[in-house]
Protein backbone atom coordinates (compact mmCIF):
# COMPACT_ATOMS: atom_id res chain seq x y z
CA UNK A 1 0.00 0.00 0.00
CA UNK A 2 3.04 2.27 -0.28
CA UNK A 3 3.34 4.59 -3.26
CA UNK A 4 6.51 3.98 -5.29
CA UNK A 5 8.36 2.70 -2.22
CA UNK A 6 7.56 5.88 -0.24
CA UNK A 7 5.11 6.53 2.55
CA UNK A 8 1.98 8.63 2.15
CA UNK A 9 2.38 12.20 3.42
CA UNK A 10 -0.50 13.23 5.70
CA UNK A 11 -0.96 16.93 6.53
CA UNK A 12 -2.70 17.57 9.86
CA UNK A 13 -4.33 20.96 10.38
CA UNK A 14 -4.82 22.18 13.94
CA UNK A 15 -5.62 25.67 15.20
CA UNK A 16 -5.25 25.41 18.99
CA UNK A 17 -1.99 25.41 20.94
CA UNK A 18 -3.36 24.20 24.30
CA UNK A 19 -3.33 20.59 25.50
CA UNK A 20 -6.94 19.44 25.72
CA UNK A 21 -8.75 16.26 24.80
CA UNK A 22 -8.67 16.90 21.05
CA UNK A 23 -4.94 17.54 21.17
CA UNK A 24 -4.21 14.41 23.22
CA UNK A 25 -6.30 12.30 20.84
CA UNK A 26 -4.45 13.70 17.83
CA UNK A 27 -1.06 13.11 19.45
CA UNK A 28 -2.04 9.53 20.27
CA UNK A 29 -2.90 9.05 16.60
CA UNK A 30 0.29 10.41 15.06
CA UNK A 31 2.52 8.64 17.60
CA UNK A 32 1.03 5.29 16.67
CA UNK A 33 0.50 5.66 12.92
CA UNK A 34 2.03 2.91 10.84
CA UNK A 35 5.20 4.78 9.84
CA UNK A 36 5.83 2.29 7.03
CA UNK A 37 2.67 3.66 5.41
CA UNK A 38 2.27 7.24 6.63
CA UNK A 39 4.46 10.25 7.38
CA UNK A 40 2.74 12.98 9.46
CA UNK A 41 3.18 16.71 8.79
CA UNK A 42 1.51 19.58 10.64
CA UNK A 43 0.24 23.09 9.92
CA UNK A 44 -0.66 24.92 13.14
CA UNK A 45 -1.45 28.50 14.09
CA UNK A 46 0.70 29.36 17.13
CA UNK A 47 3.22 28.22 19.71
CA UNK A 48 2.09 26.50 22.90
CA UNK A 49 2.06 23.20 24.83
CA UNK A 50 0.68 21.26 21.87
CA UNK A 51 3.51 22.45 19.63
CA UNK A 52 6.03 21.52 22.32
CA UNK A 53 4.52 18.02 22.41
CA UNK A 54 4.89 17.72 18.63
CA UNK A 55 8.55 18.69 18.81
CA UNK A 56 9.07 16.09 21.53
CA UNK A 57 8.09 13.41 19.00
CA UNK A 58 10.37 14.90 16.32
CA UNK A 59 7.66 16.72 14.33
CA UNK A 60 8.37 20.32 13.31
CA UNK A 61 5.14 22.05 12.27
CA UNK A 62 4.62 24.78 9.71
CA UNK A 63 2.75 27.83 11.00
CA UNK A 64 -0.25 29.35 9.32
CA UNK A 65 -3.15 31.53 10.50
CA UNK A 66 -6.70 30.18 10.30
CA UNK A 67 -8.97 33.27 10.38
CA UNK A 68 -12.58 33.19 11.54
CA UNK A 69 -15.24 32.85 8.87
CA UNK A 70 -18.19 34.54 10.54
CA UNK A 71 -16.71 37.95 9.70
CA UNK A 72 -14.47 36.99 6.77
CA UNK A 73 -11.46 39.00 5.71
CA UNK A 74 -10.85 38.16 2.01
CA UNK A 75 -7.14 38.97 2.17
CA UNK A 76 -6.52 36.73 5.19
CA UNK A 77 -8.59 33.92 3.69
CA UNK A 78 -6.62 34.05 0.43
CA UNK A 79 -3.32 34.12 2.34
CA UNK A 80 -4.31 31.04 4.34
CA UNK A 81 -5.39 29.05 1.29
CA UNK A 82 -2.26 30.10 -0.60
CA UNK A 83 -0.09 29.12 2.37
CA UNK A 84 -1.72 25.70 2.59
CA UNK A 85 -1.29 25.17 -1.14
CA UNK A 86 2.42 25.91 -0.80
CA UNK A 87 2.77 23.36 2.02
CA UNK A 88 0.87 20.76 -0.01
CA UNK A 89 3.25 21.20 -2.94
CA UNK A 90 6.44 21.49 -0.89
CA UNK A 91 5.74 18.43 1.28
CA UNK A 92 4.08 16.46 -1.55
CA UNK A 93 1.01 15.93 0.59
CA UNK A 94 -1.22 12.99 -0.33
CA UNK A 95 -4.06 13.59 2.14
CA UNK A 96 -5.19 16.31 4.57
CA UNK A 97 -6.64 15.57 8.01
CA UNK A 98 -8.24 18.67 9.55
CA UNK A 99 -8.72 18.33 13.29
CA UNK A 100 -10.81 21.42 14.10
CA UNK A 101 -13.73 23.42 12.68
CA UNK A 102 -11.60 26.55 12.27
CA UNK A 103 -9.25 24.84 9.84
CA UNK A 104 -11.83 22.67 8.06
CA UNK A 105 -13.09 25.06 5.40
CA UNK A 106 -9.64 26.38 4.47
CA UNK A 107 -8.25 22.86 4.31
CA UNK A 108 -11.12 21.73 2.08
CA UNK A 109 -10.66 24.58 -0.40
CA UNK A 110 -6.89 24.05 -0.57
CA UNK A 111 -7.44 20.30 -0.99
CA UNK A 112 -9.88 20.78 -3.88
CA UNK A 113 -7.56 23.21 -5.65
CA UNK A 114 -4.68 20.74 -5.39
CA UNK A 115 -6.72 17.56 -6.05
CA UNK A 116 -5.88 16.09 -2.64
CA UNK A 117 -8.46 14.20 -0.53
CA UNK A 118 -9.41 15.70 2.83
CA UNK A 119 -10.79 14.26 6.06
CA UNK A 120 -12.58 16.39 8.65
CA UNK A 121 -12.39 15.15 12.24
CA UNK A 122 -15.44 16.27 14.19
CA UNK A 123 -14.98 16.15 17.96
CA UNK A 124 -17.63 18.47 19.40
CA UNK A 125 -21.35 19.08 19.63
CA UNK A 126 -21.84 22.37 17.81
CA UNK A 127 -24.10 24.70 19.76
CA UNK A 128 -25.94 27.65 18.31
CA UNK A 129 -27.33 28.35 14.88
CA UNK A 130 -24.12 28.65 12.87
CA UNK A 131 -22.71 25.17 12.31
CA UNK A 132 -20.31 25.87 9.46
CA UNK A 133 -19.16 22.26 9.20
CA UNK A 134 -22.73 21.08 8.63
CA UNK A 135 -23.29 23.86 6.09
CA UNK A 136 -20.14 22.96 4.12
CA UNK A 137 -20.28 19.20 4.74
CA UNK A 138 -20.39 18.55 0.99
CA UNK A 139 -16.71 19.58 0.73
CA UNK A 140 -14.70 16.89 2.58
CA UNK A 141 -14.19 13.40 1.20
CA UNK A 142 -14.70 11.81 4.61
CA UNK A 143 -15.98 13.05 7.97
CA UNK A 144 -14.79 11.23 11.09
CA UNK A 145 -17.15 11.73 14.06
CA UNK A 146 -16.01 10.70 17.53
CA UNK A 147 -19.53 9.73 18.65
CA UNK A 148 -23.00 9.08 17.33
CA UNK A 149 -24.11 12.32 18.97
CA UNK A 150 -21.65 14.25 16.79
CA UNK A 151 -22.72 12.30 13.72
CA UNK A 152 -26.30 13.47 14.31
CA UNK A 153 -25.16 17.05 13.67
CA UNK A 154 -24.89 16.29 9.97
CA UNK A 155 -28.37 16.44 8.52
CA UNK A 156 -27.80 16.24 4.77
CA UNK A 157 -28.82 12.79 3.51
CA UNK A 158 -26.38 12.85 0.60
CA UNK A 159 -23.33 12.98 2.88
CA UNK A 160 -24.22 9.99 5.05
CA UNK A 161 -22.02 7.63 3.05
CA UNK A 162 -18.92 9.74 3.70
CA UNK A 163 -19.30 9.76 7.51
CA UNK A 164 -17.37 7.33 9.71
CA UNK A 165 -17.96 7.11 13.47
CA UNK A 166 -14.67 6.35 15.23
CA UNK A 167 -14.85 6.65 19.00
CA UNK A 168 -11.77 7.67 21.00
CA UNK A 169 -9.45 5.00 22.32
CA UNK A 170 -7.27 4.61 25.40
CA UNK A 171 -3.87 3.02 26.00
CA UNK A 172 -4.54 0.17 28.43
CA UNK A 173 -0.88 0.04 29.46
CA UNK A 174 -0.75 3.72 30.36
CA UNK A 175 -4.08 3.64 32.20
CA UNK A 176 -3.50 0.59 34.35
CA UNK A 177 -5.60 -0.28 37.43
CA UNK A 178 -2.35 -1.08 39.25
CA UNK A 179 -1.18 2.56 39.01
CA UNK A 180 -0.28 4.03 42.40
CA UNK A 181 -2.24 7.02 43.67
CA UNK A 182 -0.58 7.19 47.10
CA UNK A 183 1.83 9.98 46.10
CA UNK A 184 -1.12 12.14 45.02
CA UNK A 185 -2.86 11.59 48.34
CA UNK A 186 0.34 12.44 50.18
CA UNK A 187 0.91 15.55 48.04
CA UNK A 188 -2.52 16.93 48.95
CA UNK A 189 -2.55 15.66 52.56
CA UNK A 190 -5.44 13.27 51.99
CA UNK A 191 -5.75 10.72 54.77
CA UNK A 192 -5.90 7.07 53.73
CA UNK A 193 -9.30 6.79 55.43
CA UNK A 194 -10.76 9.62 53.36
CA UNK A 195 -12.71 8.96 50.17
CA UNK A 196 -11.86 10.94 47.05
CA UNK A 197 -14.26 12.13 44.36
CA UNK A 198 -12.66 13.79 41.36
CA UNK A 199 -13.40 15.49 38.08
CA UNK A 200 -10.92 16.11 35.28
CA UNK A 201 -11.13 18.51 32.37
CA UNK A 202 -10.81 22.03 31.04
CA UNK A 203 -12.08 24.62 33.55
CA UNK A 204 -14.66 26.38 31.41
CA UNK A 205 -18.17 27.68 32.28
CA UNK A 206 -20.03 25.17 30.11
CA UNK A 207 -18.38 22.16 31.77
CA UNK A 208 -20.77 21.98 34.73
CA UNK A 209 -18.31 22.62 37.57
CA UNK A 210 -20.82 24.63 39.61
CA UNK A 211 -23.08 21.56 39.73
CA UNK A 212 -20.17 19.40 40.84
CA UNK A 213 -19.32 21.81 43.68
CA UNK A 214 -22.94 22.01 44.80
CA UNK A 215 -23.10 18.21 44.82
CA UNK A 216 -19.94 18.25 46.98
CA UNK A 217 -21.72 20.46 49.53
CA UNK A 218 -24.66 18.04 49.62
CA UNK A 219 -22.42 14.97 49.93
CA UNK A 220 -20.47 16.42 52.86
CA UNK A 221 -23.66 16.74 54.86
CA UNK A 222 -23.93 12.94 54.87
CA UNK A 223 -20.30 11.89 54.37
CA UNK A 224 -17.84 14.30 56.00
CA UNK A 225 -14.85 12.04 55.22
CA UNK A 226 -14.84 12.89 51.48
CA UNK A 227 -12.35 15.11 49.62
CA UNK A 228 -12.93 16.55 46.15
CA UNK A 229 -10.32 16.96 43.41
CA UNK A 230 -10.81 19.36 40.50
CA UNK A 231 -8.09 18.60 37.95
CA UNK A 232 -7.42 20.97 35.04
CA UNK A 233 -6.94 24.58 34.11
CA UNK A 234 -8.85 27.25 32.22
CA UNK A 235 -8.17 27.54 28.50
CA UNK A 236 -8.96 31.27 28.45
CA UNK A 237 -11.47 32.31 31.11
CA UNK A 238 -9.30 32.50 34.24
CA UNK A 239 -11.88 34.68 35.97
CA UNK A 240 -14.25 31.70 35.94
CA UNK A 241 -11.57 29.53 37.52
CA UNK A 242 -11.20 32.12 40.28
CA UNK A 243 -14.98 32.28 40.76
CA UNK A 244 -15.08 28.51 41.36
CA UNK A 245 -12.50 28.86 44.12
CA UNK A 246 -14.57 31.62 45.68
CA UNK A 247 -17.67 29.44 45.34
CA UNK A 248 -16.11 26.72 47.50
CA UNK A 249 -15.55 29.25 50.28
CA UNK A 250 -19.13 30.49 50.01
CA UNK A 251 -20.42 26.91 50.26
CA UNK A 252 -18.12 26.12 53.17
CA UNK A 253 -16.33 23.33 51.28
CA UNK A 254 -13.00 25.05 50.58
CA UNK A 255 -11.16 22.89 53.15
CA UNK A 256 -12.49 19.80 51.40
CA UNK A 257 -11.89 20.86 47.77
CA UNK A 258 -8.56 20.85 45.95
CA UNK A 259 -7.91 22.61 42.63
CA UNK A 260 -4.81 20.95 41.20
CA UNK A 261 -4.33 23.08 38.08
CA UNK A 262 -2.89 21.50 34.94
CA UNK A 263 -1.41 18.05 35.52
CA UNK A 264 0.29 15.56 33.24
CA UNK A 265 0.14 12.66 35.74
CA UNK A 266 -3.49 11.79 34.98
CA UNK A 267 -3.18 8.01 35.60
CA UNK A 268 -1.86 8.63 39.12
CA UNK A 269 -4.58 11.20 39.81
CA UNK A 270 -7.31 8.80 38.70
CA UNK A 271 -5.69 6.09 40.82
CA UNK A 272 -6.11 8.32 43.88
CA UNK A 273 -9.87 8.65 43.30
CA UNK A 274 -12.71 6.40 44.41
CA UNK A 275 -15.30 7.87 42.02
CA UNK A 276 -14.75 9.94 38.87
CA UNK A 277 -17.40 12.49 37.87
CA UNK A 278 -18.15 14.10 34.50
CA UNK A 279 -20.58 16.97 35.22
CA UNK A 280 -20.43 18.39 31.69
CA UNK A 281 -23.55 18.08 29.57
CA UNK A 282 -21.87 19.16 26.34
CA UNK A 283 -19.07 16.63 25.86
CA UNK A 284 -19.13 14.61 22.67
CA UNK A 285 -16.62 11.95 23.70
CA UNK A 286 -14.76 12.83 26.89
CA UNK A 287 -11.39 11.10 27.23
CA UNK A 288 -11.70 10.95 31.02
CA UNK A 289 -14.52 8.41 30.65
CA UNK A 290 -12.30 5.91 28.83
CA UNK A 291 -9.30 6.61 31.04
CA UNK A 292 -11.29 6.13 34.24
CA UNK A 293 -12.95 2.92 33.04
CA UNK A 294 -9.57 1.57 31.94
CA UNK A 295 -8.38 2.09 35.52
CA UNK A 296 -11.45 0.35 36.96
CA UNK A 297 -12.95 3.50 38.42
CA UNK A 298 -16.76 3.83 38.53
CA UNK A 299 -18.26 6.89 36.87
CA UNK A 300 -21.02 9.34 37.64
CA UNK A 301 -21.71 11.33 34.48
CA UNK A 302 -24.27 13.69 32.98
CA UNK A 303 -26.67 11.83 30.71
CA UNK A 304 -26.05 14.02 27.66
CA UNK A 305 -23.94 14.38 24.52
CA UNK A 306 -21.95 11.30 23.60
CA UNK A 307 -21.59 10.10 27.20
CA UNK A 308 -24.46 7.52 27.12
CA UNK A 309 -22.66 5.79 24.22
CA UNK A 310 -19.70 5.17 26.52
CA UNK A 311 -21.03 4.82 30.07
CA UNK A 312 -23.50 1.99 30.61
CA UNK A 313 -25.93 3.15 33.28
CA UNK A 314 -26.03 0.68 36.16
CA UNK A 315 -23.16 -1.36 34.68
CA UNK A 316 -20.01 0.80 34.43
CA UNK A 317 -21.37 3.81 36.28
CA UNK A 318 -24.42 5.96 36.89
CA UNK A 319 -25.91 8.51 34.50
CA UNK A 320 -27.53 11.57 36.08
CA UNK A 321 -29.70 14.44 34.92
CA UNK A 322 -27.53 17.21 33.42
CA UNK A 323 -27.32 20.21 35.73
CA UNK A 324 -28.98 18.38 38.65
CA UNK A 325 -26.64 18.59 41.65
CA UNK A 326 -29.01 16.63 43.89
CA UNK A 327 -29.16 13.71 41.46
CA UNK A 328 -25.38 13.82 41.09
CA UNK A 329 -24.84 13.84 44.86
CA UNK A 330 -27.32 11.01 45.39
CA UNK A 331 -25.52 8.81 42.84
CA UNK A 332 -22.07 9.57 44.25
CA UNK A 333 -23.23 8.79 47.80
CA UNK A 334 -24.75 5.53 46.58
CA UNK A 335 -21.39 4.42 45.19
CA UNK A 336 -19.29 5.62 48.13
CA UNK A 337 -21.49 3.70 50.55
CA UNK A 338 -21.28 0.46 48.57
CA UNK A 339 -17.72 -0.82 48.13
CA UNK A 340 -18.86 -3.95 46.27
CA UNK A 341 -20.71 -1.76 43.75
CA UNK A 342 -17.58 0.38 43.30
CA UNK A 343 -15.58 -2.72 42.45
CA UNK A 344 -18.31 -4.21 40.25
CA UNK A 345 -18.69 -1.08 38.12
CA UNK A 346 -14.92 -0.64 37.95
CA UNK A 347 -14.27 -4.14 36.63
CA UNK A 348 -17.13 -3.84 34.13
CA UNK A 349 -15.65 -0.56 32.88
CA UNK A 350 -12.22 -2.05 32.26
CA UNK A 351 -13.82 -4.97 30.42
CA UNK A 352 -15.84 -2.60 28.22
CA UNK A 353 -12.78 -0.55 27.29
CA UNK A 354 -10.79 -3.66 26.39
CA UNK A 355 -13.60 -4.84 24.13
CA UNK A 356 -14.56 -1.56 22.45
CA UNK A 357 -12.33 1.44 23.15
CA UNK A 358 -8.66 0.53 22.75
CA UNK A 359 -6.24 2.94 21.14
CA UNK A 360 -5.22 0.20 18.70
CA UNK A 361 -8.76 -0.07 17.37
CA UNK A 362 -9.04 3.71 17.05
CA UNK A 363 -5.79 3.95 15.08
CA UNK A 364 -6.62 1.06 12.75
CA UNK A 365 -10.05 2.46 11.88
CA UNK A 366 -8.55 5.89 11.16
CA UNK A 367 -5.82 4.41 8.96
CA UNK A 368 -8.51 2.51 7.05
CA UNK A 369 -10.24 5.82 6.27
CA UNK A 370 -6.98 7.17 4.86
CA UNK A 371 -6.42 4.08 2.74
CA UNK A 372 -9.98 4.19 1.36
CA UNK A 373 -9.31 7.66 0.00
CA UNK A 374 -5.72 7.11 -1.09
CA UNK A 375 -6.63 3.97 -3.04
CA UNK A 376 -9.52 5.81 -4.70
CA UNK A 377 -7.37 8.85 -5.45
CA UNK A 378 -4.60 6.75 -7.02
CA UNK A 379 -7.03 5.13 -9.46
CA UNK A 380 -8.55 8.42 -10.64
PLM region spans:
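A conserved mid-protein helix/loop that constitutes part of the nucleotide-sugar donor-binding site
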Residues: 23-28, 195, 199-221, 242, ...
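Short hydrophobic beta-strand element within catalytic cores of glycosyltransferases
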Residues: 43, 298-301, 311
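Short His-centered aromatic/hydrophobic patch
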Residues: 98-104, 122
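A conserved, positively charged/aromatic
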Residues: 118-148, 157-158
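A short helix/loop element that forms part of the nucleotide-sugar donor recognition site in Leloir-type
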Residues: 176-190, 243-246, 363-365
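Nucleotide-activated donor-binding/catalytic signature segment of Leloir-type glycosyltransferases, i.e.
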Residues: 241-261
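Aromatic "clamp/platform" in nucleotide-sugar-dependent glycosyltransferases that forms part
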Residues: 262, 281
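Conserved acidic donor-binding segment of nucleotide-sugar-dependent glycosyltransferases
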Residues: 313-314, 318-325, 334-339
Amino acid sequence: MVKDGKTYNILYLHNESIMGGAEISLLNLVKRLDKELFTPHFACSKEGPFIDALRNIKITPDFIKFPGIRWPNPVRICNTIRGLANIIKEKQIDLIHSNQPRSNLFGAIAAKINSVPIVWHERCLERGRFDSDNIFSFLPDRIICNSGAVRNRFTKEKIDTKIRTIINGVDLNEFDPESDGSKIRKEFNIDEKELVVGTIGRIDPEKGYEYFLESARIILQDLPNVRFLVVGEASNNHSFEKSLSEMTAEKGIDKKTIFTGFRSDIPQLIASMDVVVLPSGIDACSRVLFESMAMQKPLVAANAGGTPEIVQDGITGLLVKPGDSSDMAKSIIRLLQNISLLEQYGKAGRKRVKEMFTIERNIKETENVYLELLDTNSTN
